[in-house]
Amino acid sequence: MNLIIDIGNTVAKVALFDRTSMVEVVYDSNQSLDSLEAVCNKYDVRKAIVATVIDLNECVLAQLNKLPVPVLWLDSHTPLPVINLYETPETLGYDRMAAVVAAHDQFPGKDILVIDAGTCITYEFVDSLGQYHGGNISPGLWMRLKALHQFTGRLPLVHAEGRMPDMGKDTETAIRAGVKKGIEYEITGYIAAMKHKYPELLVFLTGGDDFSFDTKLKSVIFADRFLVLKGLNRILNYNNGRI
């Protein structure tokens, strides 16, 4: 079994893979991996990968250093099954690269746009030759809602869920519709622009936020909430024998 530890900005995910098939995923705190010991005792773990976008505290570091299996710590020097053309690989978030790796692994030989809608919204492009060209970073849903409240004098902090007319009928619905529809139009705009350059483009959508697209757009999107975990597992398998 492969142990995949994905430590993000808000939560940590601990997943188990049997070769390429995900068996279980547990959501945990990124400040203390309380589920780690139970997961390791439950499965026959042979190797692990750790990927983090935050600085780990002493508690989490101690837990990870006690793992009784070889551990691959993902960094900018880790060999990857794609060609990384990013000019500053040391600044590239592991989650961005892992999502690209997973998408390319599923559809090698295809031009792919990977959209990850989480704390931030990222747009990544990998071409049919397996070359990762880079991507863009945009504020995520909660970040936009919070910014409107934090950087203005009177706008309230609005929850993402709730009534959302085409045009806001009050301040709350104006903010909700403005932010959520703005994100949807942003995403559809990226897809349209990329498909103009790459007519056979495939699109993957992952991340914690869910958006409603029209039926035509849904037909060109592969939605996969666990794309990053699958990519980390692919990277771990690719480095088998190096750890």
From Swiss-Prot:
Single GO term (MF): ATP binding
Provide GO CC annotations from the record: cytoplasm
| Needed co-factor(s) | NH4(+); K(+)
Principal localization?
cytoplasm
| Positions bound to substrate | 86, 93-96, 171
Print the keywords alphabetically.
ATP-binding, Coenzyme A biosynthesis, Cytoplasm, Kinase, Metal-binding, Nucleotide-binding, Potassium, Transferase
Q: Describe cofactor binding as the record notes it.
A: A monovalent cation. Ammonium or potassium.
Catalytic activity, as annotated: (R)-pantothenate + ATP = (R)-4'-phosphopantothenate + ADP + H(+)
Its EC number(s): 2.7.1.33
Please verify whether the record's keywords include Disulfide bond: no
Report if keyword Transmembrane is assigned.
no
- Annotated residues that bind ATP are located at 6-13, 119
Positions of the catalytic residues: 95 (proton acceptor)
Q: Where in the cell is it found?
A: Cytoplasm
A Gene Ontology annotation in the biological process aspect, one of them, is: coenzyme A biosynthetic process
Q: In which pathway does it act?
A: Cofactor biosynthesis; coenzyme A biosynthesis; CoA from (R)-pantothenate: step 1/5
The residues that hold K(+) are 116
Q: What does this protein do?
A: Catalyzes the phosphorylation of pantothenate (Pan), the first step in CoA biosynthesis.
The family classification in the record reads:
Belongs to the type III pantothenate kinase family.
| Self-association and partners | Homodimer.
Please give the name of this protein. Answer: Type III pantothenate kinase
Can you name the source organism?
A: Bacteroides fragilis (strain ATCC 25285 / DSM 2151 / CCUG 4856 / JCM 11019 / LMG 10263 / NCTC 9343 / Onslow / VPI 2553 / EN-2)
> Which gene is the coding source of this polypeptide chain?
coaX
